[in-house]
Amino acid sequence: MESKSDASVATTPIISSSSSPPPSLSPRVVLSPCAACKILRRRCAERCVLAPYFPPTDPAKFTIAHRVFGASNIIKFLQELPESQRTDAVNSMVYEAEARIRDPVYGCAGAIYHLQRQVSELQAQLAKAQVEMVNMQFQRSNLLELIYNMDQQQKQEQDNMSFESNDLGFLEDKSNTNSSMLWWDPLWTC
């Protein structure tokens, strides 16, 4: 009985009335077990491999990974990796476990397949839209060229009409063509 009271005294910080800072606690005092240890109903050790990646506030994260991979496999996998890669590995395991629960046959490969198929469909739609855009640009340029040609033809017809109706009628005598030729003769016979 004495050992239990000693253990509780050792983990409880002593508060003194002096202005000195409280004594420092050991490097990682576990106040609440990590989600993994809580779900596995075991004591969370000070150097628990799972504690940094499965906080007590998110037990569903460990539950999903544990359901697919198993706790011993997760621990073994994390111990083989350097600490810098463990966070990404845990996130990947949780993602793969969620995908496996959603699609037990294909897992994350099924999700990847669906995403690749969606990308292919979107690329086909994009190519079709680009072809339609090129066709519309071609039609627009043809229409502009047609409008320009019609406008030029209309201007030319107007110019021809105005030239024909010009006031040069005083030079020719429509009633007598011989008399008009006589009028011009003196200019060339000089």
Curated annotation (Swiss-Prot):
Signal sequence, renumbered to the chain: none
Residue spans of biased composition, Polar residues class: 1-11
Top-level division of the source organism's lineage: Eukaryota
Region (Disordered): 1-27
Domain LOB intervals: 32-133
One Pfam short name: LOB
InterPro entries referenced in this protein's UniProt entry, alphabetically: LOB
Listed transmembrane segments: none
Tissue expression per record: Expressed in young shoots, roots, stems, leaves and flowers.
GO cellular component, as recorded: mitochondrion
Family membership noted in the UniProt record: Belongs to the LOB domain-containing protein family.
Name of protein: LOB domain-containing protein 1
The organism of origin for this protein: Arabidopsis thaliana
Gene it is expressed from: LBD1
